[in-house]
């Protein structure tokens, strides 16, 4: 049902191995080595690669007037860059789409921005496996293998969090863009060796009242740094785009 109205799917990654394997499983798909030529035939591009890849890809896509769905939302952390691609999108009629990702409560946050918001706070708890290989932790002398109890490894604003944890905290970028910005959004990251899920607790206070939303996510089997729900949110968004009906927008 999802792909009935889809005419063609183009798949691109750095090496092509994964896309070739996936293309073999999908009747309407083919693996390509460059996106530029295919943009003339695309209505929508879905980025699920990395922040650097997204930064490079977004201007090219919206510059052609093509919609793009971004999973690496941290690509939009730089204000000048974000304003530039937004302006390009307005001029070409393209849309920059950001799914809810691994976080529930974004609908309420979006609604609350119509009025005054006094505080937005995101508390994320992950198992050490989901935070491996981060230079910031090495620089701070934080050794994940030595942590035996829940430990706060970062507390500050979302702008710094997104830059220090580019593969782990895209939800902070989503919340910041939807809410009160990267500098005013508070982020706390906790490492818990006993955690079996990636949990995100979103607290929003404003003239509407107070909202607290907690999501306990099953980590992705292939990438524990992200959550299974993030992939599901992209699929859900794609379904709504294809159907042209948006319930709960």
List the predicted regions and their residue ranges.
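Short, small-residue-biased leader/transition segments that mark boundaries at the very start
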Residues: 1-2
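A short helix->loop->beta-strand "cap" motif at the edges of active sites that frequently abuts
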Residues: 6, 29, 64-67, 91-94
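Short beta-strand element of Class I
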Residues: 9
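Residues in the short beta-alpha loop(s) of Rossmann-like NAD(P)-binding domains
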Residues: 12-16
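Short, conserved SAM-binding/catalytic segment
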Residues: 21-29
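Beta-loop-alpha module in the N-terminal Rossmann-like domain of NAD(P)-dependent dehydrogenases
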Residues: 30-63, 75-79
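Rossmann-fold NAD(P)-binding glycine/threonine-rich loop
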Residues: 59, 73-95
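Active-site-lining helix/loop region of Rossmann-like oxidoreductase modules
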Residues: 96-97, 102-249
